[in-house]
Amino acid sequence: MVVLAASIISKSGKALVSRQFVDMSRIRIEGLLAAFPKLVGTGKQHTYVETENVRYVYQPIEGLYLLLITNKQSNILEDLDTLRLLSKLVPEYSPSLDEEGVCKTAFELIFAFDEAICLGNKENVTVQQVKQYCEMESHEEKAHKLMMQSKINETRDVMKKKASELDKMKMERGKLDKGGYSAISGPRVVEKAFGDMSITGSGFGSGSGLGGLSMDMDSFASKPKGRPSAAATAPGKGLGMKLGKTQKTNQFLESLKAEGEVILEDVQPSSVQSRVSPLPPSDPVTVTIEEKLNVTVKRDGGVNNFDVQGTLALQVLNDTDGFIQLQIENQDVPGLSFKTHPNINKDLFNSQQVVGAKDPNRPFPSGQNETPLVKWRIHGMDESSLPLSVNCWPSVSGNETYVNIEYEAAEMFDLHNVVISIPLPALREAPSVRQIDGEWRYDSRNSVLEWSILLIDQSNRSGSMEFVVPPADPSTFFPISIGFSASSTFSDLKVTGIRPLKDGNPPKYSQRARLVTANYQVV
């Protein structure tokens, strides 16, 4: 018996809570859950439905479905027993059996599911035992929370005390100003204020400086935002540090955030961050094979440009390991042409497909940088060789434009981190996405809708998205930009071995291949 997932979904197939007990991608579980309502017939009394690959064991709970997805070899009686246990647990943690109630208690339900099912197998537990396990408390956690709360309270008390002292100093200064003694006692009050502020530990660091600077005590008082201080409006008494610049900067950042921009704080990198660097390669020799795509596809079909540019680069850590030759092989692809580095023996490469230096006594360069040795291009490829095809179908209906986009991926590549960027007309609100296979994000500043698919493999070679925007010209949604990567290449070039030019065993090596997009558009 193997339970693949335990889920709570709506009648329409919307996933509210789902706990997977085996390694399963999000796209696959969403597809299985979305397909379930179509398989359930009306008026039938069965509690399970079978497909070609999985079995659904389900129970309606008011307007929702409690669902187990299992493999077809599982014991249906044990599955039903597990389902009964979960059906008793759900009301214990979600008294309101509707979408909102289930979503609010999602984590509690997942924890309960974990206590009832372990690695796809039912645990021999009761409802009371599950509740007891989930409610177990940690003494260390309680002590830590009490300690943190104590520190928060202590800090709050110190802040209140300092605020009270500042208010008293302000009142004292106001009385002195009215009595005509401000010229005598003013600087002393300011000096005392700086001494008190240094106690808080915040100071005036980060490049602001205090040399030759006096400060108006109104800037320390608590005021409503946007109300200028007396020092900001009164011309030069020589007493005031104007804080208007910081306020304007904050307002500008807030306006950018309101437009959807992601604002990163401008901070100096810490010593810890400055020490972080990419991990060095573990093998003495590393071969990197990379192909870049430059593709322009017509929206009505056909290809304007399809260009593949590849590079074989070598990284050698030690000089002693640089006296080597690389034996390579590749697929016989039409239109494939190679170009070698001037220091590479071209005759040896053309006759035996061996990458070696012209001078055998001269090693390959060593260090942390990669050295490109061979480049190639592939010309004359047609639309049937595209790794990913995208079609866009905008249609205006009344006061709305319905846009349907679909993708089809070739069998020869598994694509990673796919992002399809669709330009949109200027909108006041985000578009209404009706259906999507994957995730979406709206960049309001650039007016671009980004459709993201983490992985395209055999389980999802095709997919679609539908969204609605106000009336717009169909050409507004072009050009569509596409980005992705793959771990295989068109040429399928690889290193099959390393020949040492000096006595001894060949050094250990590793190789990595990747296909990336330089410019991939539908126009």
Swiss-Prot record:
Alphabetized Pfam families for the sequence: Adap_comp_sub
Keywords: Cytoplasm, Cytoplasmic vesicle, ER-Golgi transport, Golgi apparatus, Membrane, Protein transport, Transport
Topology with respect to the bilayer: Peripheral membrane protein
Locations listed in the record: Cytoplasm; Golgi apparatus membrane; Cytoplasmic vesicle, COPI-coated vesicle membrane
Domain MHD span(s) in chain numbering: 282-523
InterPro entries named in the record: AP2_Mu_C_sf, Coatomer_dsu, Longin-like_dom_sf, MHD
GO terms for cellular component: COPI vesicle coat; Golgi membrane
Keyword Transport assigned: yes
CDD domains, per database record: AP_delta-COPI_MHD, Delta_COP_N
UniProt keyword annotation of Cytoplasm present: yes
Superkingdom of origin organism: Eukaryota
Function (record text): The coatomer is a cytosolic protein complex that binds to dilysine motifs and reversibly associates with Golgi non-clathrin-coated vesicles, which further mediate biosynthetic protein transport from the ER, via the Golgi up to the trans Golgi network. Coatomer complex is required for budding from Golgi membranes, and is essential for the retrograde Golgi-to-ER transport of dilysine-tagged proteins.
Subunit structure, as described in the record: Oligomeric complex that consists of at least the alpha, beta, beta', gamma, delta, epsilon and zeta subunits.
Family recorded in the similarity comment: Belongs to the adaptor complexes medium subunit family. Delta-COP subfamily.
Protein name: Coatomer subunit delta-2
Organism: Oryza sativa subsp. japonica (Rice)
